[in-house]
């Protein structure tokens, strides 16, 4: 790596590691705006994914953490873990490891009531798999606020009939109310990413609000539908025609996957699951 690139990627003596997808947030105005969107309250159960050098961690701790109710954080980079422990002490409980394998449910309060808030500047190279991993814990989550690549956020909030509407749109919109909150330019980071970023808010639907469906079946159906985006559903969903009376259901196969609302995918998945029972 050249000296100039090292300097650009160095912040507080730490060189950003590409394999961890590290881009450190450095713009204090942007940091303050993000914290205002999150609105942390004293004593809340909150976990930050990828705290990095603590740019967002510090104001979160100031607003909510106590030694009895610390901010939790999941961090993979062991060099950063030591720095964070030294800086924040017992106000931050660190969990060393990969967020893609972490059991976020272990941080929730006992019982059925949602109690956990999740925040983070997510590594862009694993953002989609991580969002899917988090759906397994939606039942115990109050809300999620993430910094993501703007293109990903646009897909998360996309409406049917638009090019941005995708498998990610369907699977996340089934489980969450999703709103884009804030645009973040590349120059807010060190090193600056090559893409624009945005803050997104995700609020899980309560279980009684969700139409009952086998999410594995829904995922398989949606994956098949979007497997060849330019083809009609009569081709991509051909394997389902024996188990689903699409015509009787009023489901038009002369459409592309991006034209079908979430509720229609859910209804077909319910029928597919029932046929396998």
From Swiss-Prot:
The keyword Cytoplasm applies. Pfam families: RrnaAD. Specifically dimethylates two adjacent adenosines (A1518 and A1519) in the loop of a conserved hairpin near the 3'-end of 16S rRNA in the 30S particle. May play a critical role in biogenesis of 30S subunits. One of its GO terms (molecular function) is RNA binding. It is found in: Cytoplasm. It comes from the Bacteria. The keyword Transferase applies. Keywords: Cytoplasm, Methyltransferase, RNA-binding, rRNA processing, S-adenosyl-L-methionine, Transferase. Its EC number is 2.1.1.182. One of its GO terms (cellular component) is cytosol. S-adenosyl-L-methionine binds at residues 23, 25, 50, 75, 98, 121. Belongs to the class I-like SAM-binding methyltransferase superfamily. rRNA adenine N(6)-methyltransferase family. RsmA subfamily. It catalyses: adenosine(1518)/adenosine(1519) in 16S rRNA + 4 S-adenosyl-L-methionine = N(6)-dimethyladenosine(1518)/N(6)-dimethyladenosine(1519) in 16S rRNA + 4 S-adenosyl-L-homocysteine + 4 H(+). This is Ribosomal RNA small subunit methyltransferase A. It is an enzyme of class 2 (transferase). Its main location: cytoplasm. InterPro entries: KsgA/Erm (IPR001737), rRNA_Ade_diMease-like_C (IPR023165), rRNA_Ade_methylase_Trfase_N (IPR020598), rRNA_adenine_dimethylase (IPR011530), SAM-dependent_MTases_sf (IPR029063).
């Amino acid at each position: 790596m050249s000296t100039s690139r090292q300097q650009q990627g160095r912040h507080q003596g730490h060189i950003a590691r590409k394999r961890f997808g590290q881009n450190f947030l450095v713009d204090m105005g942007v940091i303050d705006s993000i914290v205002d969107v999150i609105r942390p309250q004293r004593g809340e159960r909150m976990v930050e994914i990828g705290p990095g050098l603590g740019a967002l961690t510090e104001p979160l701790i100031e607003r909510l953490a106590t030694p009895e109710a610390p901010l939790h954080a999941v961090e993979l980079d062991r060099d950063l873990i030591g720095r964070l422990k030294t800086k924040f002490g017992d106000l931050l409980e660190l969990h060393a490891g990969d967020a893609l394998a972490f059991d976020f449910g272990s941080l929730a309060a006992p019982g059925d009531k949602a109690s956990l808030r999740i925040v983070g500047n997510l590594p862009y190279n694993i953002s989609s798999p991580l969002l899917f991993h988090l759906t397994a814990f939606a039942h115990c989550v109050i809300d999620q606020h993430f910094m993501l690549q703007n293109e990903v956020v646009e897909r998360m909030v996309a409406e049917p009939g638009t090019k941005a509407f995708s498998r990610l749109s369907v699977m996340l919109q089934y489980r969450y109310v999703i709103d884009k909150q804030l645009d973040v330019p590349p120059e807010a980071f060190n090193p600056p990413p090559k893409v624009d970023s945005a803050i997104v808010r995700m609020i899980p639907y309560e279980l009684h609000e969700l139409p009952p469906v086998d999410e594995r079946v829904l995922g398989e159906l949606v994956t098949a539908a979007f497997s060849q985006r330019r083809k009609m559903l009569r081709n991509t969903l051909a394997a389902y025609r024996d188990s689903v009376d699409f015509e009787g259901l009023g489901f038009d196969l002369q459409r592309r996957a991006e034209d079908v609302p979430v509720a229609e995918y859910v209804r077909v998945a319910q029928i597919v699951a029932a046929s396998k029972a």
